[in-house]
């Protein structure tokens, strides 16, 4: 079985240790399963049997955007698909998105909690319009956050509003549509033509609910993801293998959906 992990994080070697320590110190229960570096991710992938990983950076300050996006070119490989970043409260985002599109980046990650913005506010619609026009993928951190945040910046009904206004925008709502808000997800967005990834759900969602949700939403819109380094990639792979899901559907979730969405060879 080929496997694409659609939701991973790394940091430059010189700051990875510091970044890991900062997050573990501010997030209850957080534990890293790699050292947060590119090599650490690759080692974890090897142990888990993962062929390819999507890296999702987050600019928590406007000054970080250019450095992160410039690193994308060096990260691109058969095994690594780096996404870019923007800082939504600046007016620089059209230039940043244009740059990412020109160098072949597949999409961007937005973290409404870390970046402190409400995704449904109309002042952010120009971002979605450009991404839709450029045919780039938008990954939202969706739902609550285990860190010191309110967790109301990307609720299921807000994701629905973004989709309704930009129906051709390729949206990935991380954490099965909304971390710890799966009742709302099932009510608001379960059957919309957007993708969910499975990251950071194994410990909390429950097998019965997970199986019900992927059946209702459609396995063709589910992407395997782990949120590495914060979750053990090998255990997440093993978990999905054990579920009572057909081999055909496991292939879709593990790699076929992501391969088609990313338009890559594997």
Predicted regions and their residues:
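Mid-to-C-terminal alpha-helical segments outside catalytic/metal-binding sites
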Residues: 1-10, 15-52, 216-221, 234-266
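Conserved, mostly hydrophobic/aromatic
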Residues: 7, 45, 72, 100, ...
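Histidine/acidic-residue-rich catalytic or RNA/ligand-binding cores of hydrolases
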Residues: 15-18, 150-158, 181-190, 206-215, ...
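Divalent metal-binding pocket/active-site signature
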Residues: 35, 59-63, 88-91, 102-186
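Acidic (Asp/Glu)-rich catalytic clusters
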Residues: 42-49, 69-81, 96-105, 125-134, ...
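Short, well-structured secondary-structure segments
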Residues: 49-64, 77-86, 109
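Short acidic/histidine-rich active-site segments
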Residues: 175, 199, 217-234
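His/Asp/Glu-enriched short active-site or ligand-binding loop at hydrolase and phosphoryl-transfer sites
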Residues: 193-205
């Amino acid at each position: 079985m080929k496997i694409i992990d659609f939701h991973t994080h790394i940091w430059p070697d010189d700051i990875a240790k510091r970044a890991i320590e900062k997050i573990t110190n501010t997030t209850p229960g957080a534990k890293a399963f790699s050292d947060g570096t590119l090599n650490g991710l690759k080692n974890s992938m090897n142990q888990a049997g993962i062929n390819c990983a999507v890296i999702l950076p987050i600019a928590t300050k406007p000054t970080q955007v250019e450095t992160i996006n410039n690193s994308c070119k060096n990260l691109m490989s058969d095994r690594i698909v780096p996404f870019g970043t923007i800082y939504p409260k600046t007016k620089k985002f059209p230039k940043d998105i244009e740059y990412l599109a020109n160098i072949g980046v597949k999409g961007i990650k937005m973290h409404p909690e870390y970046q402190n913005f409400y995704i449904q506010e109309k002042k952010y619609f120009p971002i979605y319009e450009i991404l839709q026009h450029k045919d780039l993928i938008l990954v939202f951190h969706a739902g609550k956050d285990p860190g010191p945040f309110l967790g109301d910046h990307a609720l299921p009904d807000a994701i629905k509003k973004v989709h309704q206004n930009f129906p051709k925008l390729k949206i990935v709502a991380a954490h099965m549509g909304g971390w710890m808000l799966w009742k709302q997800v099932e009510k608001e967005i379960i059957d919309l033509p957007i993708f969910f990834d499975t990251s950071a759900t194994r410990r909390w969602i429950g097998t019965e609910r997970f199986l019900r949700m992927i059946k209702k939403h459609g396995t063709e819109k589910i992407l395997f993801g782990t949120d590495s380094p914060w979750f053990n990639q090998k255990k997440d792979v093993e978990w999905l293998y054990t579920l009572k899901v057909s081999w055909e559907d496991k292939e879709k979730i593990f790699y076929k959906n992501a391969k088609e969405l990313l338009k890559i060879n594997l």
